[in-house]
Amino acid sequence: LSKITKEKTIGFTPTMGALHQGHLSLIEESKEKCDITICSIFVNPTQFNNANDLANYPNTINADLEKLKRLACDIVYTPAIEDLYEKGEKEKEFDFGSLTTSMEGKFRPGHFSGMATIVEKLFNIIQPTIAFFGQKDLQQLQIVKALVKQMKSVIKIEGIPTIREESGLAKSSRNELLSENAKKEAILIYNCLNYCKNNKKKGIPYLKHYITRQLEQHENFKLEYAEIVALNTMRPIET
């Protein structure tokens, strides 16, 4: 990085590996808009509030590197835990207000503090011009934008549209943990989203009830939340 001059623009995509077309679309966007494209691969332990989730997270580093090579990603940063965390270091505490009080923030305590901790560390190391994140994790995207403001940084955050399977299922590294039958059943989530998009006039209470009813009648779904939120605050909208 020390060889990169200030005249060069740096595009950065932080990932936890197990790369799929969603990740690769971020790299492609960076290649198009920036002089230098950097991707990091690091499974961040502080954003997992479930030890089994961390232990089972897919590790496909060789395949990941091959995919990045095919896209001509300029630099791949693959730090070890000790490169980023002191021994015994915990996640940093942040105050993102209402951005973290609903949805993933409610059901995965500590997740966003861990995510923001590692993103801040990576931003300080890479010092990108633009950082690319997927819109699939919309709550995370809004928190990263808030993080940059708290850092008083000039890093630009770009959200890239969700990449989906032909079935409509959003591309996700954790899809690899699903059986083929479970993947087919998960399409119901996309169908519910489309229904809401096409029936906005029915009103928020009706749409939330519709999603809840559709998902809860399937025994393989355990619904944690179904929310319609204000983009800038992530606060649920009830009417």
Predicted regions: what they are:
Residues 239:
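Acidic/histidine-enriched ion/cofactor-binding microenvironments in catalytic or ligand-binding pockets
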